[in-house]
Regions:
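Karyopherin-beta/Importin-beta family HEAT-repeat alpha-solenoid scaffold
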Residues: 1-890
Length: 890
């Protein structure tokens, strides 16, 4: 590693350069160095990072490479844990830790992030790096300001990466003590205070036990309030305190301990809102988010009337989910806040997070949490305001007043306490309809459509048979013509809600069926969407809204109506083709390329829905036109996109074997997608599409060698997402089945891959998360399924190519059965089926591996899943078959 040390600076700069080719060369060079000797590589980078005489840019790059190597490479993480000695790790850690004494702030910060990255993968930190926390907590009191700041900052980063399983309460005590004692000290600079508050925001997640103790809780909260009082005019400090309260109140358990501090927290929130709402909207919004955190917690609690298991980090604590009514205590102040700060949105901020929208969300929470008397008075005031402003459709002031009333009323509509709301709505529903029809005030149209959206979502039965036709005609007529994003989204989502509620599109028997209105809905959606596609002048969002509504129609419609929808979609295809041929001209005319691409993607999403639901096979000529368009889009965009892959996948499932000629043309694009490892979503869509194409066509279209090579590359690549690897393994089984005994030439590399993958998940230790457990379960299931496919392919006892692998296959199955930590019924069911198949082929020969005692224990394990419920008939039948094999062979 001597020569790499000489030019590592140059390689680091090359890997971060502007030129793509040079950058790729640099990244590959770094990768090669890491693969040759990871320990030496990290030591060199640590030495660069700690060297004060080095160029700061080089030092920062070295920190980034260390961090990314450990956080984002599964292979390097594994080597760190299993191949690098404790002495080598300690040397690397010491180099990084020493960098916290750097005179340069950005270098200290980068060192802190590297330390936290090591803490994330090297747990429990008190065992793997026992000197770290004592060093940081001691240096938090260091007289050297730079050392003090870097220690506090790093404590925060470390706490961000830790959870309740990776640190004990004694060390949390030490961290909290270092932060709080520093906070209490009067001589700290503002810079130190800001760093302490930031670190405390991360550490508070771990301080459950500290908060349960009343004395400690008082010290923590009072120290925060004292800082707030001292720095009440300093926006930076106030912002950090607000963020700390938001973090604290987002953790369910803390809600149960804030009663004595609640009004003080609210006083802080209302105070900074009033002070900064005109001059600092960001800070004012933080104040409202503190209030929202309390309301969100209480709304979640009204859905529980039992002791609920709440998770903090990865630690489990049983908490009383009682709603303590904090929100109701401040309802008068909230009502005043709402009345003064809700404003009609303008075009620039209507869908953004702003003070008015935050107040509307607070109103929604208040309508669910405030006592009935409070809300009854609020609704009475709204009713009176409606009466004052319900005359005249030409007075813009009256219309805008009504628009604000509808915004307020719509925000109150929720699944609880709707009696008063329903009365107001019933007496004013036709006024709301009129406000949607009028064309003087767009804000009024939008707020009225917002009311309709909320009603169709929460109380759709309000539109009974007498109103259903009117609302459908109104919505579909407006959808036909509108080009406003928000308004269109409200209308289309309202229509989708009605389709889902009244979507009895297969019969006209129900008086509340949408079936009589199907033609109106579809035709109006088509006219509007056709204009979008033809002109590409609307925002892609309006087209998406229309397409999503057509998609909902597909899901809830009968077969004959799906046929009508398919005819509409064919017409869309003609329009898409036409615009595709004129894209360059349209772009020159000023139409945004991304808008064009988005609408194309939405169209393919619609195709996917149709092909998934449509029972009649798509004709080959229509399918070929879809393919031609797909290929044209691929070539023009110089890439493949997920939605097109998934649409082709759905088309293959619809067409079955008749899809073969298209599959042959489509395959190169599938392969391209799969190999695009840097985009896991695209790679996944390619894998899914390949699987469905092979299953549908039931052939490998003379591409078996290429397919197997691609799938093996997917499984061994470090760049590929774990879930994509399980899909690749499952595809191998299907390829084998359709290739038949000719697959024998691939059996050795495939079995090597499967047995290598099979080792994953064993000896994981105790520090594994739920996500990893679920992945290993899926992986094992897919490996077993692939073994089953191979067994079905080579099912001749004589000269069976699997004979030499039989013992290893069975050992894997036994390991899965014995591993109770990572096990489920689906895995056991697939094992049972495979064992029966193997008995069927090998008979007494297989009995040498699977003896009667083992089989009896396996059966008992499966039966344990059905102690309190009836056994699945398939499992019951397979158990009897397994028993019969032993009877026959005795």
């Amino acid at each position: 590693m001597a020569s790499p040390q000489i030019n590592i600076d140059e390689i680091l700069l090359q890997a971060q350069g502007a030129d793509e080719n040079q950058r790729s060369l640099g990244m590959n060079a770094l990768k090669n160095l890491a693969q040759q000797n990871l320990s030496s590589f990290l030591t060199i980078l640590g030495t660069i990072l700690s060297n004060e005489s080095k160029d700061p840019k080089i030092r920062i790059l070295s920190a980034i490479v260390i961090k990314n190597s450990l956080l984002y490479s599964e292979d390097y993480r594994k080597k760190w844990k299993t191949e690098i000695s404790k002495e080598e790790k300690d040397k690397i850690k010491l180099l990084i830790l020493s960098t916290l004494a750097s005179s340069q702030k950005n270098i200290r910060t980068m060192a802190g992030t590297v330390i936290s990255s090591i803490c994330k993968i090297d747990t429990p930190i008190t065992e793997t790096w026992p000197d770290l926390l004592p060093s940081l907590t001691n240096n938090a009191f260091n007289e050297d300001i730079n050392m003090k700041l870097s220690a506090i900052e790093t404590l925060g980063y470390v706490c961000e990466e830790l959870n309740m399983k990776s640190i004990d309460s004694a060390n949390v005590d030490k961290i909290m003590n270092a932060l709080i004692q520093n906070l209490i000290k009067g001589e700290n600079t503002k810079q130190v205070i800001l760093q302490l508050l930031k670190a405390l925001s991360y550490a508070i997640r771990l301080a459950q036990k500290n908060f349960e103790n009343k004395n400690e809780r008082n010290i923590i909260m009072n120290s925060i309030f004292q800082i707030g009082d001292k720095y009440q005019t300093d926006e930076d400090v106030i912002e950090k305190i607000a963020m700390l309260f938001i973090e604290m109140l987002s953790i369910s358990s803390y809600y149960d301990y804030i009663e004595e501090f609640f009004l003080q927290i609210m006083k802080f929130s209302f105070g900074i809102f009033d002070k900064y709402k005109e001059s600092n909207e960001k800070l004012a919004l933080f104040a409202l988010e503190i209030i929202l955190s309390v309301g969100d917690e209480e709304v979640s609690r009204i859905n529980y009337d039992f002791i609920n298991l709440n998770k903090i980090g990865n630690g489990n604590y049983t908490l009383d989910k009682k709603n303590r009514g904090y929100f109701n205590k401040i309802s008068p102040e909230l009502q005043k806040l709402i009345e003064q700060n809700v404003k009609l949105p303008d075009d620039d901020n209507e869908d953004s997070w702003n003070i008015s929208n935050a107040c509307l969300k607070i109103l929604n929470l208040m309508s669910q949490l405030a006592d009935s008397n409070t809300m009854h008075k609020f609704y009475e005031n709204l009713s009176n305001e409606i009466k004052k402003n319900n005359q005249g459709q030409n007075d813009i002031n009256l219309l805008n007043n009504r628009a604000k009333i509808w915004l307020l009323l719509g925000s109150c509509i929720a699944r609880v306490n709707i009696t008063d709301i329903a009365k107001i709505l019933n007496s004013n529903i036709y006024l709301i309809f009129d406000d949607i029809r009028q064309n003087i005030s767009m804000p009024l149209k939008k707020s009225a459509s917002y009311i309709i959206l909320k009603v169709t979502k929460e109380i759709p039965k309000m539109f009974d048979s007498s109103r259903l036709g009117k609302i459908i005609e109104l919505l579909s007529a407006e959808i036909k013509a509108s080009q406003d994003n928000i308004y269109m989204a409200n209308l289309c989502r309202s229509l989708q809600n009605l389709i889902k509620c009244y979507g009895d599109l297969e019969t006209n028997k129900s008086s509340s069926s949408l079936s009589p209105y199907f033609e109106i809905i579809l035709n109006n959606l088509f006219v509007g969407a056709e204009q979008d596609i033809k002109n590409y002048q609307a925002s892609a969002k309006t087209t998406l809204s229309r397409f999503m509504t057509i998609g909902t129609l597909i899901e809830y419609s009968s077969h004959d109506k799906q046929f009508q929808i398919s005819q509409i979609i064919k017409q869309f295809l003609i329009q898409i083709e036409s615009t595709q041929n004129n894209i360059d001209t349209m772009i020159k005319a000023g139409i945004d390329k991304e808008t064009i691409f988005q609408i194309q993607e939405y169209y393919f999403s619609l195709l996917q829905k149709l092909f998934n639901k449509y029972k009649t096979k798509i004709e080959l000529d229509f399918a070929d036109k879809i393919w031609q368009l797909t290929e044209a889009l691929f070539k023009y965009r110089q890439t493949v996109f997920d939605e097109a892959n998934l649409a082709m996948s759905a088309l293959a499932r619809n067409m079955g074997e008749t899809f073969e000629p298209i599959f042959k043309k489509y395959y190169p694009y599938v392969e391209y997608s799969i190999k695009y490892y840097s985009n896991n979503s695209l790679s996944k869509s390619g894998l899914v599409s390949l699987m469905h194409c092979i299953i549908s066509v039931q052939k490998n279209i003379d591409k078996t060698k290429d397919i197997i090579s691609t799938l093996i590359d997917v499984c061994v690549s470090n760049e590929v997402e774990k879930k994509n690897k399980t899909i690749a393994i499952s595809i191998i089984g299907y390829v084998a089945m359709f290739e038949g005994t000719n697959f024998s030439i691939y059996i050795d590399p495939v079995m090597k891959l499967l047995f290598s993958a099979a080792q994953m998940g064993f000896n994981l230790g105790y520090n594994i998360d739920e996500e990893l457990i679920e992945f290993v379960k899926t992986l094992r299931f897919q490996i077993i399924q692939t073994f089953t496919c191979l067994e079905m392919t080579f099912n001749n006892k004589e000269n069976n190519i699997l004979n030499s692998y039989m013992k290893d296959i069975f050992e894997f199955l036994k390991s899965c059965i014995n591993d109770t930590k990572i096990q489920n019924l689906e895995i056991l069911k697939s094992i049972l089926s495979l064992i029966n198949d193997l008995f069927g082929i090998y008979g007494s020969q297989f009995k040498e591996l699977c003896n009667e005692n083992f089989a009896a224990g396996f059966i008992k394990l499966i039966q344990g899943y059905f102690t309190n419920k009836q056994m699945d008939p398939d499992i019951e039948q397979n158990i009897e078959i397994l028993k019969m094999f032993f009877i026959q062979n005795n």
